[in-house]
């Protein structure tokens, strides 16, 4: 399980709320996952949806280092943009500085708006402007047909988030793979606030098989690629047999 710091379904009102949330991500969720034999990894940040209040964002950013030593923390994320606002850009830059200062992997959220392309370009420019940030250690999530090319061309990893109605459906994701190949790209799913299907990735694998893709190709996209990216964190433990 890879669980990024996320929006709570409402905007939190204080840094203490985030402190408690980070305790949940680094202490309670790993224990809960272990009851079912699952390793649990997490990412830390203040989500772009809550980045308009710069004062609150600075308070949250100040407490993140306290949790970065937790054994299940693999990086900073999911950072990025929601409305492409000036304040969101400021908080994004501060997150990138935090990641660069601590040699952390980066997980990026791209906006779900008509200006996703603009937001993705802004994010890539911020990442590339910091010489400490290596593209191969960053995954740009929620790519779609009009943004995946720029992400891969700049050397970053691309994540396709599979949803039944928004973001990217399984069939669209497979079409993208047929155009752009299966290097530095993966699929993911979620249990989200909106309509979502946690089993979307294995369902997509079945559709890939139906289209004639062989087992090795499918395994690379849905399993080996995520393992390759996550293994860049010294805290990620490769599954046995790989």
Please name every model-derived segment:
Residues 34-36, 129-134, 180-181, 210-216:
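Short helix-capping segments at alpha-helix termini
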Residues 2-6, 162-167, 191-192:
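Short, acidic/turn-prone active-site loops that include or flank metal/cofactor-
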Residues 1-106, 110, 114, 118-122, ...:
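Mid-domain alpha/beta scaffold segments of enzyme catalytic cores
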Residues 167, 194-198, 230-231:
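Short active-site-adjacent structural elements
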Residues 202-242:
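Mid-to-C-terminal alpha-helical segments outside catalytic/metal-binding sites
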Residues 93-178, 186:
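Catalytic pocket-lining loop regions of alpha/beta-barrel enzymes
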Residues 180-199, 218:
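Short acidic/histidine-rich active-site segments
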Residues 42, 78, 99, 158, ...:
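Conserved, mostly hydrophobic/aromatic
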């Amino acid at each position: 399980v890879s669980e990024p710091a996320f929006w709570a379904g409402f905007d939190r009102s204080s840094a203490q709320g985030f402190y408690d949330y980070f305790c949940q991500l680094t202490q309670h969720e790993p224990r809960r996952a272990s009851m079912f034999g699952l390793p649990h990894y997490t990412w830390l940040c203040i989500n772009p949806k809550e980045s308009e209040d710069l004062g609150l964002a600075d308070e949250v950013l100040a407490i993140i280092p306290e949790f970065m030593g937790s054994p299940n923390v693999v990086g900073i994320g999911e950072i990025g943009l929601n409305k492409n606002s000036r304040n969101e850009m400021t908080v994004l830059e501060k997150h990138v500085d935090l990641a660069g200062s601590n040699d952390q992997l980066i997980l990026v959220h791209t906006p779900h708006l008509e200006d996703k392309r603009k937001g993705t370009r802004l994010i890539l420019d911020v990442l590339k402007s910091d010489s400490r940030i290596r593209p191969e250690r960053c995954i740009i999530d929620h790519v779609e047909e009009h943004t995946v090319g720029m992400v891969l061309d700049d050397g970053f990893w691309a994540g396709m988030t599979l949803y039944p109605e928004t973001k990217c459906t399984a069939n669209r994701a497979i079409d993208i793979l047929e155009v752009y190949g299966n290097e530095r790209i993966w699929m993911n799913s979620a249990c989200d606030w909106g309509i979502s299907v946690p089993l979307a990735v294995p369902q997509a694998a079945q559709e890939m098989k139906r289209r004639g893709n062989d087992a090795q190709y499918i395994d690379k996209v849905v399993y080996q690629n995520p393992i390759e990216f996550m293994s860049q964190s010294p805290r990620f433990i490769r599954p046995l047999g790989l």
